């Protein structure tokens, strides 16, 4: 899980004070990754407000010492933005966290799913910030055997379960990750690829490259 996240804002102090005035809990303890205003978010994780970015420089310049062998501005492999980050919440808490983002930051709902499988089920509410750049699916299990429930037990609480990154060329980008030594999760069974044209008719994805 991720222990914190940071949002880029125009005025960090204003964003922090606004959130606290709406009921957010300010974080005033030790151990912050950045010396910027922060509130307590999902599962006790921190939500930082960062105003130093772009032409203003980087919020991390004064927090980390770059080593000689590290490049502070690496070329990267082709991932350019965060598409979304998912929260796993306890049963009955989805409305609580939906209200947290709605009341504090003006988020709106873009999708709602009630998925019932053969063995497990879940409810998912996808929400987005007013600017559309921050998307958060809130996931809540409907049984004791789901992946969400396993996460909550292993992590011992709610939290950020995964992040999804965006790219213009997913095959080239993932090939570069593999070349850099990243190990991927096991792929889906062969039937996933065999049935792909039935599920998504007319798709032109290169099946053999997908299998890699």
Where in the sequence are the language-model features?
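Eukaryotic phosphotyrosine signaling hubs
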Residues: 2-3, 160
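Vicinal oxygen chelate
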Residues: 4-83, 87-89, 94, 111-140, ...
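A short, polar/proline- and glycine-enriched secondary-structure boundary/capping micro-motif
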Residues: 59-61, 147-150
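Short, flexible, solvent-exposed loop/turn segments with mixed acidic/basic and small polar residues
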Residues: 74-77, 150-155
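Long hydrophobic segments that form regular secondary structure
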Residues: 101-107
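Conserved secondary-structure micro-motifs at functional edges
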Residues: 138-149
């Amino acid at each position: 899980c991720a222990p914190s996240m940071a949002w880029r804002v125009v005025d960090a102090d204003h964003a922090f004070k606004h959130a606290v005035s709406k009921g957010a809990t300010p974080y005033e303890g030790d151990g912050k990754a950045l010396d910027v205003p922060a509130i307590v978010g999902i599962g006790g994780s921190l939500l930082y407000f960062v105003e130093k970015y772009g032409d203003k420089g980087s919020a991390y310049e004064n927090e980390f010492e770059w080593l000689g062998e590290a490049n502070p501005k690496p070329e990267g492999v082709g991932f350019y933005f965060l598409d979304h980050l998912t929260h796993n919440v306890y049963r009955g808490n989805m409305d609580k966290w939906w209200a947290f983002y709605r009341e504090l930051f003006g988020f709106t709902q873009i999708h709602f799913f009630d998925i019932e499988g053969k063995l497990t089920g879940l409810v998912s509410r996808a929400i987005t910030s007013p600017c559309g750049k921050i998307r958060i699916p809130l996931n809540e299990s409907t049984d004791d055997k789901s992946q969400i429930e396993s996460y909550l037990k292993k992590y011992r609480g709610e939290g950020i379960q995964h992040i999804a990154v965006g790219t213009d060329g997913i095959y080239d980008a993932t090939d570069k990750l593999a070349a850099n030594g990243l190990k991927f999760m096991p792929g889906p069974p062969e039937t996933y690829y065999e049935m792909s044209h039935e599920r998504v008719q007319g798709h032109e994805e290169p099946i053999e490259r997908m299998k890699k």
